[in-house]
Structures are given as structure tokens and as C-alpha cells.
């Protein structure tokens, strides 16, 4: 497996589409998925490759002068629990530090709502994120938004 930073907007969108469309349990709302794909073109973007096959990606965005967010991340299901997400995160975290950010944040569905998101929550906690706040209706009442944060200092 190799992690590469992708700089070409079309390539970012191609990889994001390939991965997100293969993950309907997490990215099943077409409008939301298209927004992730569209916005990923202009953001710092890292992709994981198995040979020349893109198997995952992570995209950062700025949410404040001192804070970057893991805007969207996806790894093909057959590559889950193989260190792909951890490697993508390590590359993105390093870039966030280089860009001068003090904090990273990530949003996901609160633990206890859906098994696939419970695994996502455990992944972020294992990376060292801490619980910050839950917004019960930011997305909608069925998907309470859990925000996790991490200091980069």
C-alpha cells in the first residue's frame, strides 16, 4: 500500500467518486455524496493505493484559522481493518501540522445509532481524537452529529 497526495482536481474527484459510491452504508444519500465529491477537488487530498488501484482517500478542509477538519474519508470495505485509514490519517495529520493548524476535528454520526458508524467512532477514538460535542439536529434528528477534536501541538 502506498499513500500519495493528489493535486489534480479531476483525479481527486475520480477517486472520491470511486470510493464513496462503493460505500452506500456510509454515503448512501446521493446529494451529500455529490457534495463531498465536488468539494474535494479544491482541498488537500490523500489517496491510498494497492498497486495502481485507489482503495481509499482522505480530504481535509479548513474550518477556522487554527483548525482543519477531516472533511471526508473513505476506504473500500474489503480494505477495512488493514491500516489504510490509519496511514491516510497519518499523512493528513502531518500536512495539517505543516500548514500550521493547531487542531483537527471530525464529524460523524453519534455512537449508538448505527453499527457501521459505531465502528467509525471507535476508529476516530483509537486515532486519539476526543469527544467534543454532540449536535442532536445539525444533520437531522435521526443522525446526531458527534464532533471529535485533537490537538496538533
What are these regions, as identified by a protein language model?
Residues 96-115:
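Conserved GNAT acetyl-CoA-binding A-motif
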Residues 76-82, 112:
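Active-site acidic-Proline motif in GNAT/NAT acetyltransferases
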Residues 111-134:
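Conserved active-site alpha-helix within GNAT-family acetyltransferase domains
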Residues 66-77, 105-107:
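Conserved acetyl-CoA binding element of GNAT-fold acetyltransferases
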Residues 43, 143-147:
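Short hydrophobic/aromatic beta-strand or adjacent loop that forms the aromatic wall/cage
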Residues 47, 53-61, 69-74:
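Conserved beta-strand in the GNAT
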Residues 81-94, 98:
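Conserved acetyl-CoA-binding loop-helix of GNAT-fold acetyltransferases
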Residues 1-31:
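Short amphipathic alpha-helix that is part of the acyltransferase structural core
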Amino acid at each position: 500500500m502506498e499513500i500519495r497526495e493528489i493535486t489534480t482536481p479531476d483525479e481527486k474527484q475520480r477517486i472520491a467518486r470511486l470510493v464513496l459510491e462503493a460505500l452506500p452504508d456510509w454515503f448512501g444519500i446521493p446529494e451529500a455524496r455529490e457534495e463531498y465529491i465536488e468539494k474535494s477537488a479544491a482541498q488537500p487530498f490523500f489517496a491510498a493505493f494497492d498497486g495502481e488501484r485507489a482503495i481509499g482517500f482522505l480530504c481535509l478542509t479548513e474550518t477556522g484559522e487554527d483548525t482543519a477538519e477531516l472533511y471526508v474519508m473513505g476506504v473500500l470495505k474489503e480494505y477495512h481493518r488493514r491500516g489504510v485509514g490509519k496511514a491516510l490519517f497519518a499523512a493528513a495529520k502531518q500536512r495539517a501540522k505543516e500548514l500550521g493548524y493547531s487542531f483537527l476535528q471530525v464529524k460523524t454520526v453519534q455512537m449508538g445509532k448505527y453499527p457501521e458508524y459505531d465502528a467509525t467512532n471507535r476508529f476516530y477514538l483509537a486515532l486519539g481524537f476526543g469527544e467534543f460535542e454532540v449536535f442532536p439536529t445539525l444533520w437531522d434528528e435521526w443522525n446526531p452529529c458527534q464532533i471529535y477534536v485533537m490537538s496538533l501541538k
